[in-house]
């Protein structure tokens, strides 16, 4: 069995999608029309460093991931058994599963990016060396009540999210802990997957009412629940994803329990491939 995984914010880089925009000219033109700017120029030239601003990052990654997927299935003539995406990448997983078309997905991520960009002064940091329980305990002990766990990327790679000054304070405290191997501030423009996204979630929920989705043709593993999407709760799950933790470790563990599973990352970079390698390694090391 094979699962295709789609990356989210943090995987963007100048030059991504090179070659794809000309190959899929019709969809590229469609994207330009929806966005009101050239997606090719944004990805290849990165004017005003816009690629690192969430309102641009999200549509850019969605388009590049989608075109990468279309090229892959056209060239290889194979469809995956399962799909999953990290945060923004989940929209590409739903697109691959034919829950909505390219255009609908782009309209959704454009709105998602716009709403998330309105909430400023946030930050995120990855804490390496501690598991989710240990990070939660440390946040409590250090009275960092305004910091949330945003992503469980691997058993010992936990991302925290909150106001910029609180994240800086948290990072300094985590660095003093002997078990912590590294604290890495993330190059993001907001406190994603935290309570600070509640307003964005509410507005996005309203926006979703206008759209029609189809039942997924391939199981899509949800970040929020680490199990397949159900059609009835699709819109609710997408809205919840904005202010809930990304359960990436649990999602990959769920897929690994299905039997012999191969994973292929579709889109720019290999961040998810590295995380999956870590999850597998830690699963092997854990006592049964």
Curated annotation (Swiss-Prot):
The keyword Isomerase appears for this protein: no
Name of the protein in question: Polyketide biosynthesis malonyl CoA-acyl carrier protein transacylase PksC
Annotated GO MF terms: [acyl-carrier-protein] S-malonyltransferase activity
Sections of the chain in a coiled coil: none
Keyword terms, alphabetized: Acyltransferase, Antibiotic biosynthesis, Cytoplasm, Transferase
Keyword Transferase part of the UniProt annotation: yes
Family that this chain belongs to: Belongs to the FabD family.
Enzyme class: transferase
Recorded name of the encoding gene: pksC
UniProt cross-references to SUPFAM superfamilies, sorted A to Z: FabD/lysophospholipase-like, Probable ACP-binding domain of malonyl-CoA ACP transacylase
Location, primary (coarse class): cytoplasm
Gene Ontology CC annotations of this record: cytosol
Active site: 87, 193
InterPro entries per record: Ac_transferase_dom_sf (IPR001227), Acyl_transferase_dom (IPR014043), Acyl_Trfase/lysoPLipase (IPR016035), Mal-CoA-ACP_Trans/PKS_FabD (IPR050858), Malonyl_CoA-ACP_transAc (IPR024925), Malonyl_CoA-ACP_transAc_FabD (IPR004410), Malonyl_transacylase_ACP-bd (IPR016036)
EC number in record: 2.3.1.39
Recorded metabolic or biological pathway in which this protein acts: Antibiotic biosynthesis; bacillaene biosynthesis
């Amino acid at each position: 069995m094979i699962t295709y995984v789609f990356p989210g914010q943090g995987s963007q880089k100048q030059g991504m999608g090179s070659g794809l925009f000309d190959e899929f000219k019709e969809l590229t033109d469609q994207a330009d029309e929806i966005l009101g700017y050239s997606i090719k120029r944004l990805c290849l030239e990165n004017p005003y460093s816009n690629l690192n601003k969430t309102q641009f990052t999200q549509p850019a990654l969605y388009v590049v991931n989608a075109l990468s997927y279309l090229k892959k299935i056209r060239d290889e003539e194979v469809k995956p058994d399962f799909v999953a995406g990290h945060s923004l990448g989940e929209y590409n997983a739903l697109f691959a599963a034919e829950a909505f078309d390219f255009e609908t997905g782009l309209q959704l991520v454009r709105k998602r990016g716009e709403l998330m960009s309105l909430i400023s002064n946030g930050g995120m940091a990855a804490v390496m060396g501690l598991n989710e329980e240990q990070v939660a305990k440390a946040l409590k002990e250090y009275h960092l009540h305004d910091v949330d766990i945003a992503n469980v990327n691997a058993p010992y790679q936990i991302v925290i999210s909150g106001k910029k000054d609180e994240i800086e304070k948290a990072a300094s405290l985590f660095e003093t802990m002997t078990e912590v191997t590294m604290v890495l501030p993330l190059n993001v423009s907001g406190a994603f997957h935290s309570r600070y996204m509640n307003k964005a979630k509410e507005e996005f929920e309203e926006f979703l009412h206008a759209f029609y989705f189809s039942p997924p043709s391939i199981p899509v593993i949800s970040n929020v629940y680490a199990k397949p999407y159900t059609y009835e709760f699709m819109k609710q799950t997408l809205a919840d994803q904005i202010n809930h933790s990304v359960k990436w470790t649990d999602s990959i563990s769920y897929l690994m329990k299905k039997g012999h599973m191969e994973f292929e990352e579709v889109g720019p970079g290999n961040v998810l491939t590295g995380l999956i390698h870590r999850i597998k390694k830690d699963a092997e090391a854990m006592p049964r």
